[in-house]
C-alpha cells in the first residue's frame, strides 16, 4: 500500500539492483524518492518499514532497507538526487558521507538487526566497473521507494438546449506521467435519465502525458413547455490504478434548457361570415384550456 505526503504518492517497488528499482519507479510515472527534510524521512519510516523489513532474516533478527534516489556519478565526486537537485538535507550513517567511496545507489536503513528503529542513509560500495547490483540473498536491498507526483482532475459544467449535443472537458494538472482511468457517472436532478438524456456510466483513460479529455453529452428533445432541467456528472478514480487520482472539482452541473415552442399563436380570418355564423378553427399544436372566472 502507498501513502500520500503533500502532492506526492509514495510506494514500494521491487529491485535487487538500484537501477532496477529506479526503472520500476519510473514506470509508475515518478522516480526513486528524493528526501528533502526530516519530516519526509520519518514519513517513509512510519509508512514503509513493515513492507520492507524481513522478519528474523537468516536467524539474525529483523532487517530491511530500501533504495532511495541518492546517487553519485563515478567521474564526479558530487553526490546528487536523481532529479538533479543538490543534497540539502542529509541523514548519513557512520562514515557514509565520504565522497571518496566509489558507489551508486543510496538506501534507507529502516530497521536494525535487533528490531529497533533506524532512520539513517547508507551506501553500497561498488567496483566502478560493475553494475549496481547486489547478491539476491542480501537482506537490505530487495526494494526501492518510489515518489510519484499526484495528478489532479476537474470537470467542466455544461449548458445546452434540448436536442443538442455538446462536449464536456476533463482536465488534468500536477503529475502527468502516470496512466490513470477516470470513471464518469450521472445522477438525476430535475432531469431524468431515459426521458431527458442517456444515463452516463463510462471510463475515460488518460495515457502518460495527456492533460485533457472530452466526451459528448446529448440532451433529448420534447414538445413540453417546462423550466430548465439539471443533472450532475461525477468523476472518480477507478480504484485499480497504481497511483490514486486526486480531484479539485469532481462534479459537473449539466443544465438542459427548454426548447419547446412558446410563441403565442396568431389567427387571421380567411373569409368574412355573417354575424352569428359558426367558424371552425383548426390548430396543429396541443392546447391547454383556461377557464374564465
Spans of features found by a protein language model:
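Conserved, well-structured core segments
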Residues: 66, 106, 144, 168, ...
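Extracellular, disulfide-bonded carbohydrate-recognition/adhesion ectodomains
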Residues: 1-151
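Solvent-exposed loop/turn segments flanking beta-strands in beta-repeat/beta-sandwich domains
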Residues: 179-181, 287-293
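Solvent-exposed, low-complexity segments and loops of surface/extracellular structural proteins
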Residues: 263, 282, 290-293
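A structural micro-motif recognizing beta-strand termini
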Residues: 13-15, 218-221, 284
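Short, exposed beta-strand/loop patches in secreted or surface proteins that constitute
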Residues: 1-3, 109, 245, 268-272
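Short amphipathic, basic-aromatic surface patches that mediate peripheral association
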Residues: 172, 284-288
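Short boundary segments that mark the start of a structured unit
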Residues: 151-264, 273-280
Amino acid at each position: 500500500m502507498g501513502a500520500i505526503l503533500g502532492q506526492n504518492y509514495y510506494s514500494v517497488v521491487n529491485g535487487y539492483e538500484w537501477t532496477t528499482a529506479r526503472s520500476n519507479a519510473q514506470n509508475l510515472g515518478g522516480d526513486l524518492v528524493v528526501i528533502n527534510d526530516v519530516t519526509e524521512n520519518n514519513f517513509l519510516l512510519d509508512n514503509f518499514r513493515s513492507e520492507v523489513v524481513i522478519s528474523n532474516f537468516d536467524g539474525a533478527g529483523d532487517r530491511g532497507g530500501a533504495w532511495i534516489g541518492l546517487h553519485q556519478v563515478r567521474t564526479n565526486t558530487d553526490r546528487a538526487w536523481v532529479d538533479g537537485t543538490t543534497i540539502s538535507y542529509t541523514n548519513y550513517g557512520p562514515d557514509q558521507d565520504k565522497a571518496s567511496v566509489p558507489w551508486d545507489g543510496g538506501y534507507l536503513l529502516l530497521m536494525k538487526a535487533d528490531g529497533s528503529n533506524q532512520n539513517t542513509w547508507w551506501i553500497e560500495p561498488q567496483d566502478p566497473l560493475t553494475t549496481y547490483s547486489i547478491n539476491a540473498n542480501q537482506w537490505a536491498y530487495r526494494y526501492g521507494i518510489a515518489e510519484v507526483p499526484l495528478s489532479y482532475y476537474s470537470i467542466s459544467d455544461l449548458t445546452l438546449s434540448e436536442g443538442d449535443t455538446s462536449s464536456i472537458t476533463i482536465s488534468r494538472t500536477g503529475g502527468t506521467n502516470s496512466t490513470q482511468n477516470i470513471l464518469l457517472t450521472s445522477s438525476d436532478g430535475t432531469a431524468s435519465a431515459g426521458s431527458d438524456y442517456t444515463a452516463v456510466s463510462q471510463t475515460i483513460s488518460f495515457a502518460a502525458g495527456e492533460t485533457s479529455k472530452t466526451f459528448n453529452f446529448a440532451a433529448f428533445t420534447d414538445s413540453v413547455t417546462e423550466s430548465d432541467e439539471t443533472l450532475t456528472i461525477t468523476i472518480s478514480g477507478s480504484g485499480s490504478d497504481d497511483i490514486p487520482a486526486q480531484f479539485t472539482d469532481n462534479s459537473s452541473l449539466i443544465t438542459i434548457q427548454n426548447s419547446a415552442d412558446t410563441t403565442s399563436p396568431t389567427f387571421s380570418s380567411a373569409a368574412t361570415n355573417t354575424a352569428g355564423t359558426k367558424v371552425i378553427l383548426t390548430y396543429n399544436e396541443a392546447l391547454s384550456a383556461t377557464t374564465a372566472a
